[in-house]
């Protein structure tokens, strides 16, 4: 009898815990994905802060030339970063217990791998938590679908790209100038500016910003006045009101006359779906582009593609870009390679686009 009561009490305790985890009445919804998300993001955040402030230099290239990334070792907010795991580690899973000591783990950049893996699990769980809360509230699942775009982008630069390149040292550093360095080196090695999927991503981000600004300004310009001239228009809106707060017909008419009739949406639902889908699809395509370039399926190469009738090269902007790529590749990791692969495997390229005339 006593054992039965204990089992019932423990079962009730578990049921109460489950009800609390999945309750939509909490100030912040936790959910089962939140059980995984919270410790992962807390771990990633705490280790990032500690490493950014105090981590010792990391031998990123695996050639015994440590690179300083933390504030305590001479960096500032702009130059500081969590330096990626050493090239000597490659793609090996490198938790603390795999190193001979904590000093060795820090020297080989173990914190980077710890932060990145916990962060990716955390943001993926956040996406799942969005779906879970939508499901509990009876909503459609498009919020988590939209968030899948930044999740895909983060996964591409922090996981897929290092896998394709064979080392976590090729992942994006966790800092401002480190991010810029990653972008420049990525351009030098993969010609990302000439990749169609990157172009689609640029169109998605800038187009999304443009459409957001257009939509916000149109709505703000066609608000239905519910207040006097001496009050803010915003005071005319009551949360949860059933009537429209702006005149969609006026906004539609304005924009249709500004551009042309069919450039303006007459359906608010399809308009907002478009506003959500445009940047999401663009960022999806960029993440796919990064993931393909990770395995060296690079951007288009139009170098020396225009020649005259006598076979002489007429340089285009593609050749200028190629020259910049070679220059960046020469400068980065200058002690890790004897010579950049692109330069070593091709014929000699003249430094100047045209040879200067020399007077005798």
Swiss-Prot record:
For chlorophyll a ChlzD1, which residues are the binding ones? 118
Catalyzed reactions: 2 a plastoquinone + 4 hnu + 2 H2O = 2 a plastoquinol + O2
Per the record, where is site Tyrosine radical intermediate? 161
Indicate which residues the UniProt annotation says bind Fe cation: 215, 272
**What biological-process GO terms show up in the record?**
photosynthetic electron transport in photosystem II; response to herbicide
Provide the binding site for [CaMn4O5] cluster: 170, 189, 332-333, 342, 344
Report the PTM annotation.
Tyr-161 forms a radical intermediate that is referred to as redox-active TyrZ, YZ or Y-Z.
Q: Which GO terms describe its molecular function?
A: chlorophyll binding; electron transporter, transferring electrons within the cyclic electron transport pathway of photosynthesis activity; iron ion binding; oxidoreductase activity, acting on diphenols and related substances as donors, oxygen as acceptor
Site annotated as Stabilizes free radical intermediate: where? 190
Residue spans crossing the bilayer: 29-46, 118-133, 142-156, 197-218, 274-288
Query: What family, per the record?
Result: Belongs to the reaction center PufL/M/PsbA/D family.
Q: What is this protein called?
A: Photosystem II protein D1
């Amino acid at each position: 009898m006593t054992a039965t009561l204990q089992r019932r009490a423990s079962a009730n305790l578990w049921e109460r815990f489950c009800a609390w985890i999945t309750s939509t009445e909490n100030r912040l919804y936790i959910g089962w994905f939140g059980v995984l998300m919270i410790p992962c993001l807390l771990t990633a955040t705490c280790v990032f802060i500690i490493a950014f402030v105090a981590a010792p230099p990391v031998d990123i290239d695996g050639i015994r030339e440590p690179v300083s990334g933390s504030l305590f070792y001479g960096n500032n907010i702009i130059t500081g970063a969590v330096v990626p795991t050493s090239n000597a580690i490659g793609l090996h899973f490198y938790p603390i217990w795999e190193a001979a000591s904590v000093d060795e783990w820090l020297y080989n950049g173990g914190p980077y791998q710890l932060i990145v893996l916990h962060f990716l699990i955390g943001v993926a769980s956040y996406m799942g938590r969005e779906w879970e809360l939508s499901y509990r509230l009876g909503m459609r699942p498009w919020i988590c679908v939209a968030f899948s775009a930044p999740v895909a982008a983060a996964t591409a630069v922090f996981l897929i790209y290092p896998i394709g390149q064979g080392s976590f040292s090729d992942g994006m550093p966790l800092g401002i100038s480190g991010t810029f360095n990653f972008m420049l080196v990525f351009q030098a090695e993969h010609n990302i500016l000439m990749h169609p999927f990157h172009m689609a991503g640029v169109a998605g981000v800038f187009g999304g910003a443009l459409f957001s600004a257009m939509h916000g300004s149109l709505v703000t310009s066609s608000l239905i006045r519910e207040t006097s001239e001496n009050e803010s228009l915003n005071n005319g809106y009551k949360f949860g009101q059933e009537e429209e707060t702006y005149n969609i017909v006026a906004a539609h008419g304005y924009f249709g006359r500004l551009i042309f009739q069919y450039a303006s949406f007459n359906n608010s639902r399809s308009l907002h779906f478009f506003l959500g889908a445009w940047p999401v699809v663009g960022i999806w395509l960029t993440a796919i582009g990064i993931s393909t370039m990770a395995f060296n399926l690079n951007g288009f190469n139009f170098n020396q593609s225009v020649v005259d009738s006598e076979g002489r090269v007429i340089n285009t902007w593609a050749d200028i870009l190629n020259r910049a790529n070679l220059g960046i590749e020469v400068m980065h990791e200058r002690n890790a390679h004897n010579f950049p692969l692109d330069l070593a495997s091709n014929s000699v390229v003249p430094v100047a686009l045209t040879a200067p005339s020399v007077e005798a």
